[in-house]
């Protein structure tokens, strides 16, 4: 996929959350400039300064700069003279958005822009009415499935592998895939509905499979370990770091999990993809990071981003049926992607136990998830009361048929209790009857006077009643 000539010569700024306290919010801004253009000038209150070069790829130069803004209801920065207000106040009342699944597997960039990005526009209107301080993006920020096949040697991925690649072939494939990934990100970042939010609300993002390719980590080991597979992963990882973290350099290999401690709040984002294999969800580094971010002492509230739902129906029943009968074999990778897979049950219990222990220790813990293109909520009983999971998916992905949502709802009625004496239950959204709501959606988390609540915004039905969490 070539870089479209119709793209503007400058795209951005995009804001990334780097930290904050009672006095300031720490940020990073990213601006893409077509090669040959002047460096963008950033003014964060101390006069304009040229933004340093972070990366160059596919005909664009990417400029990134770290800066801080004082805590305020409407702090301001400017890029090339265009000013943007940011709500940097992190103490007291707080509004946080959560989105996931920003695209579709096939033909996503061919969709009508206004239709595709209708919920981004709705999120922008919600922000304009009552500003957000943070936007969390929980996975599948792009659907790069087509980009992984952007070179003839990759056209059959993942079923038809080309065999070992020479150094020249690897370089050629890398360049083709890098160009395709870059074109997709730039096209999406240039969309006005996304750009409005991205310049005004700093984001913290964690990837999932479609940011690489459908089912990454749950595919056959020979595909994951092939020269083509490792090249695809390297391209996707570099693209994630640049576009979703604003980092142009390379980082040490391993998991990309991260957490931020803010006033009264920790945001924890485990990486469930970098070390994933058919037989595991996380490797040693991922578990080291996750154990640390879920350990006490912690602020009074922890939001845990699990790109794949941690509390869900008994999908292992469906997985058993597929494995025994061979029916619906094409869904085996999707089923193995789930925490509930037979292959991951021990890890799932370990993850749930860490969540439960943190919650029971006095830190109110809430799981945020996406991935399923539906909205729902769930609870797991703990000694300190119910631990909530809130699922919002997707902001751009077309919802599945109602029959699929009903089937999942029937499966959810079986219940599940991977931890003895701590049953998991799935629930309808406030004011709704079905367990799963099949409308495009995003989630708003609000802290008011120290109390937290969640509100889903649904494309057709509007905002739900608040759910106290």
Where are these regions (language model features)?
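Metal-dependent phosphoester/phosphodiester hydrolase catalytic core
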Residues: 1-469
